[in-house]
UniProtKB/Swiss-Prot annotation:
Subunit description: Interacts with TRAF6. Interacts with APC.
Family: Belongs to the peptidase C64 family.
GO BP annotations listed: cell migration; cytoskeleton organization; positive regulation of Wnt signaling pathway; protein deubiquitination involved in ubiquitin-dependent protein catabolic process; protein K29-linked deubiquitination; protein K33-linked deubiquitination; protein K63-linked deubiquitination; regulation of cell morphogenesis
Stretches the record annotates as Disordered: 38-73, 202-224
Protein encoded by which gene: Zranb1
GO MF annotation, one: K63-linked polyubiquitin modification-dependent protein binding
Record bears the keyword Disulfide bond: no
Protein name according to UniProt: Ubiquitin thioesterase Zranb1
First-listed, main subcellular location of the protein, grouped into a coarse class: cytoplasm
Enzyme Commission number: 3.4.19.12
Species name: Mus musculus (Mouse)
InterPro entries, per database record: AnkUBD, OTU_Deubiquitinase, OTU_dom, Znf_RanBP2, Znf_RanBP2_sf, ZRANB1_OTU
Domain notes: The RanBP2-type zinc fingers, also called NZFs, mediate the interaction with ubiquitin and determine linkage specificity. RanBP2-type zinc fingers 1 and 2 (also named NZF1 and NZF2) specifically recognize and bind 'Lys-29'- and 'Lys-33'-linked ubiquitin. RanBP2-type zinc finger 3 (also named NZF3) binds 'Lys-33'-linked ubiquitin and shows weak binding to 'Lys-6'-, 'Lys-48'- and 'Lys-63'-linked ubiquitin chains but it does not interact with 'Lys-29'-linked chains.
Enzyme class label: hydrolase
């Protein structure tokens, strides 16, 4: 192989780079990637189109179904010169027309008859193009799908394209028409498709002239008349159509350039469900793909089949829609093993990313000696009151998908830690719900953001702020931590002293935990998070570590109140958030929106409007003992009355008619962040569309069958 042959040419600047280069040396453009996704080749009658293609070039001798655009692959030699040789030039405007055109496409001038001395090659009539190799990725694009159209018959009711062996439409169950009607319908569609393909190729011009060459079918009289009428009509809007095609082509190219291997495998699996190809689903599963993944707007646009694909659809939705019972059994098994969940952050990834950017923009660092990071916005997440308007079966499905039932059971039934007061949970509408989140070391950060903004800390924005605050304000937090640990040990009768080096080693370990994504966090990190939020954090948790046999191993020390004591009180909010702790896992505890009743609590006239939701969070446990306040200094430590006084200074407290000391958490849908409100509405719309009488496994009816 020569030196020229082993190099790859850049698709932007045409510079020839060495094979080891992953980017262009001149313009730094990314090296084009090859074919990624393959599936079994179609068994069509027009398989001779790709006869010169070697199946061994792809894995398993299969041909690709969905792959990146041809612009993202290494360039192949174009057949542009061959196409131009077969075209005839108009004697009026010199436009190069297709050989079968009897009039000029641009000026509609009559084609001149061939001169007796003119060679067949120059005129283009009667000459046959030389066979060439077809790009496998372009063999199955929209233009070459004309060759496989004979395998399908179109339903006369819903226009769905069914396979040839289907006796009735798989969407609407309409019986297949007789052979004469089917042939006429197929001919009509083929004629219109040919017209559209000619139009597309003409407006793309030289940009698309290097694509796969097609063999033209014999032109009938009816086709000629239709094409002539179509050409006359389209000339008026030619410029606008060309610009729209160019914009659409550029947009699709940008989307394809952002796609990764997993994305192509997912799209291939979606098409595999529609076409009945189980191998595509197996390929996606074997790559570690998420079965519950949903289609985005860009992916739907790339698939370009609105009748089959819609935003938010999963593989399960598609299997139900197209009645793939064998695939549905496999997919539902996978989803059940993953204990499928659907929280608001999962429904709309685009809104979730915008919320993450809002959080990052609202993080600022305080100037001065105490250079701690803080959030500028006060946001409290609550479950929408519209949930109660849903049918009972739909409500049960919603709670199964958004709540952590195991945590809820452990905090409510196994130990009376939350919702133990009937007065708070029922009469005052302050029942707490444990939201599901990732069961990893990031659960504390996830639960904090879920209790405020309703999303995960996926990009570790909050973890980075936590680490930077601990590092920049290390002296302040270290002093509080050291004094608290010494007092806590002495309160249990453990009288010991550590060298300063040992204290420093333990503190360095706490700092290292904050910088490692996925690392479990401790009480000190909750104390720092209270300063970042500028609001108190109340943790309701189990008191003891237990083994798998149920044996008590030690105290957990997480339950209690964490106040932002190092800030000024005027700089902080008094509305707290609540977290739950069970066996090494944190969960966000949120309430449901209520009507904002007045005069709730003994002598407490709230004087609030109906839009404000007030949740009463108990500051005592089920035994009516005051919750511990963590990280108090020696001057702030005292008896229970002094700690209650401190709580009243940092929280809006009141006593209910039952004598329970509570803190008021206030939230308002109208004053909440609009992105959070929009995300919750989109999530709730998913359940509003579910019919209560459904018998489908995923709880959704196929609402669009009649629109197909």
């Amino acid at each position: 192989m020569s030196e020229h042959g082993i190099k790859w040419a850049c698709e932007y600047c045409t510079y020839e780079n060495w094979p080891s280069a992953i980017k262009c040396t001149m313009c730094r453009a990314q090296r084009p990637s090859g074919t990624i996704i393959t599936e079994d080749p179609f068994k069509s009658g027009s398989s001779d189109v790709g006869r010169d293609w070697d199946p061994s070039s792809t894995e398993g001798g299969s041909s690709p179904l969905i792959c990146p655009d041809s612009s993202a692959r290494p360039r192949v030699k174009s057949s542009y010169s061959m196409e131009n040789a077969n075209k005839w030039s108009c004697h009026m405007c010199t436009y190069l027309n297709w050989p079968r055109a009897i009039r000029c496409t641009q000026c509609l001038s009559q084609r001149r008859t061939r001169s007796p001395t003119e060679s067949p090659q120059s005129s283009g009539s009667g000459s046959r193009p030389v066979a060439f190799s077809v790009d496998p990725c372009e063999e199955y694009n929209d233009r070459n799908k004309l060759n496989t159209r004979t395998q399908h018959w179109t339903c006369s009711v819903c226009t769905y394209e069914n396979w040839a062996k289907a006796k009735k439409c798989v969407v609407c169950d309409h019986p297949r028409p007789n052979n004469i009607e089917a042939i006429e319908l197929a001919e009509t569609e083929e004629a219109s498709s040919i017209i559209n393909e000619q139009d597309r190729a003409r407006w793309r011009g030289g940009c698309s002239s290097g694509n796969s060459q097609r063999r033209s079918p014999p032109t009938t009289k009816r086709d000629s008349e239709v094409k002539m009428d179509f050409q006359r009509i389209e000339l008026a809007g030619a410029v606008g159509t060309k610009e729209e095609l160019e914009v659409d082509f550029k947009k699709l190219k940008q989307i394809k350039n952002r796609m990764k291997k997993t994305d192509w495998l997912f799209l291939n699996a979606c098409v595999g469900v529609v076409e009945g190809d189980l191998a595509a689903i197996e390929a996606y599963k074997s790559s570690g793909g998420d079965i519950a993944r949903q289609l985005t707007a860009d992916e739907v646009r790339l698939l370009n089949r609105p009748s089959a694909f819609d935003v938010g659809y999963t593989l399960v939705h598609l299997a139900i829609r197209f009645q793939r019972q064998d695939m549905l059994a496999i997919l539902l098994t996978e989803v059940s093993q993953q204990a499928a969940k659907c929280i608001p952050a999962m429904v709309c990834p685009e809104l979730t990313e915008q919320i993450r950017r809002e959080i990052a923009a609202s993080l600022h660092q305080r100037k001065g000696d105490f250079a701690c990071y803080f959030l500028t916005d006060l946001v409290t997440f609550t479950l929408p009151a519209d949930i109660e308007d849903l049918p009972p079966t739909v409500q049960e499905k919603l709670f199964d998908e958004v709540l952590d039932r195991d945590v809820q059971k452990e905090l409510e039934e196994e130990s009376p830690i939350i919702n133990w007061s009937l007065e708070l949970a029922t009469r005052l509408d302050s029942r707490l719900y444990a939201l599901w989140n990732r069961t990893a070391g990031d659960c504390l950060l996830d639960s904090v953001l879920q209790a405020t903004w309703g999303i995960y800390d996926k990009d570790s924005v909050l973890r980075k702020a936590l680490h930077d605050s601990l590092h920049d304000c290390s002296h302040w937090f270290y002093t509080r931590w050291k004094d608290w640990e010494s007092w806590y040990s002495q309160s249990f009768g453990l009288h010991f002293s550590l060298r300063e080096e040992q204290w420093q080693e333990d503190w360095a370990f706490i700092l290292s935990l904050a910088s490692q994504p996925g690392a479990s966090l401790e009480q000190t990190h909750i104390f720092v998070l209270a300063h970042i939020l500028r609001r108190p954090i109340i943790v309701y948790g189990v008191k003891y570590y237990k083994s798998f046999r149920g044996e008590t191993l030690g105290y957990t020390r997480f339950q209690g109140v964490y106040l932002p004591l190092l800030w000024e009180q005027s700089f902080c909010w008094k509305s707290p958030i609540a977290l739950g702790y069970t066996r090494g896992h944190f969960s966000a505890l949120v309430a449901m929106e209520n009507d904002g009743y007045g005069n709730r609590g003994a002598g407490a006239n709230l004087n609030t409007d109906d839009d404000v939701t007030i949740t009463f969070l108990p500051l005592v446990d089920s035994e009516r003992k005051l919750l511990h306040v963590h990280f108090l200094s020696a001057q702030e430590l005292g008896n229970e009355e002094q700690q209650e006084k401190l709580l009243r200074e940092w929280l809006d407290c009141c006593v209910t008619e039952g004598g329970v000391l509570v803190a008021m958490q206030k939230s308002s849908r109208r004053r909440n962040h609009p992105l959070v409100t929009q995300m919750v509405e989109k999530w709730l719309d998913r359940y509003r569309q579910i019919r209560p009488c459904t018998s489908l496994s995923d709880g959704e009816e196929d609402e669009d069958d009649e629109d197909e």
